[in-house]
């Protein structure tokens, strides 16, 4: 009886810690990316981040007895990982021209695109889900119309394809034979990061100088906390709580990113942009509620 009681106490504590990691760590990575860009080329930084995180996590999991993925599972991980890591890399590219807060607000529309893409596999939105899609898209249009994105066409294009790539990878991950548990995240990060590193070399990216202390600390933070810790927390939540709770980070990350950008990054955020954030999150919330977890 005592063991059962302890398990019941430990599980909620673990869920709270995992949610904290997703809400605040992933929300803070937008500002971390901006700081890391002071010393790292965008694609090199993204690729190295995920190769380092995936390699260390994979080695730790294998040392603890996790099974070696089959070739078929590696292939699925390469496809999903490329889409997800490419989505993240495009955020890094976009943050060369837009603020971390604006990038986070734009990326908050990702679940909306995921619902649309899921319709291609036959799961079209219900009536209220269409309402959520319309509300969320109005938020994106408001953000664009105010000029936060319009002032940077390159940043707008990068963020648009970032949301599509991440959404496609998320939807596809449910239909492919990925490895079991956290090993899937490690394999995805390894494969996706390697693809981005190749793209960086082809693009001719080079270090103009040795990265400064702030850029190095930010990069280390992205590797350890943004990738290893947060991805592990996400995998834990997917195993223990409803998907609607596990993916609720999409509602909180933009708020954290906007706040940190204003407090620590000296970024400004207009009232109209806050309205856009509210519309996007309302739309995502309606869709999530209709999906019923």
Segment roles from a protein language model:
Residues 2-9, 50, 215-217, 251-293:
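C-terminal-most transmembrane helix of multi-pass membrane proteins
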Residues 56-68, 110-131, 255-274:
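C-terminal transmembrane-helix exit sites in multi-pass transporters
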Residues 11-16, 38-47, 69-75, 130, ...:
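Juxtamembrane helix-entry segments on the extracytoplasmic side of multipass membrane proteins
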């Amino acid at each position: 009886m005592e063991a059962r009681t302890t398990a019941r106490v430990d599980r909620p504590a673990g869920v709270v810690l995992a949610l904290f990691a997703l809400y605040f760590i992933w929300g803070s990575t937008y500002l971390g990316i901006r700081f890391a860009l002071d010393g790292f080329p965008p694609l090199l930084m993204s690729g190295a981040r995920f190769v380092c995180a995936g390699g260390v996590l994979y080695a730790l999991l294998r040392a603890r007895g996790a099974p070696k993925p089959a070739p078929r599972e590696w292939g699925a991980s390469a496809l999903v990982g490329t889409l997800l890591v490419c989505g993240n890399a495009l955020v890094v590219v976009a943050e060369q021209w837009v603020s971390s807060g604006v990038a986070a607000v734009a990326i908050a529309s990702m679940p909306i695109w995921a619902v649309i893409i899921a319709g291609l596999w036959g799961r079209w939105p219900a009536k209220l889900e269409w309402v959520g899609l319309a509300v969320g898209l109005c938020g994106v249009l408001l953000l664009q119309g105010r000029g936060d994105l319009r002032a940077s066409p390159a940043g707008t294009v990068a963020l648009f394809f970032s949301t599509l790539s991440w959404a496609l990878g998320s939807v596809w991950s449910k239909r492919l034979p990925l490895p079991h548990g956290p090993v899937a995240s490690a394999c995805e990060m390894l494969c996706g990061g390697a693809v981005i590193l190749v793209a960086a070399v082809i693009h001719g990216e080079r270090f103009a100088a040795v990265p400064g202390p702030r850029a190095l600390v930010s990069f280390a933070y992205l590797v350890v906390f943004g990738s290893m810790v947060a991805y592990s927390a996400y995998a834990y939540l997917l195993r223990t709580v409803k998907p609607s709770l596990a993916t609720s980070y999409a509602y909180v990350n933009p708020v954290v990113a906007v706040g940190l950008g204003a407090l620590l990054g000296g970024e400004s955020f207009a009232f109209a942009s806050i309205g856009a954030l509210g519309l996007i999150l309302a739309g995502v919330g309606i869709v999530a509620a209709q999906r019923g977890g």
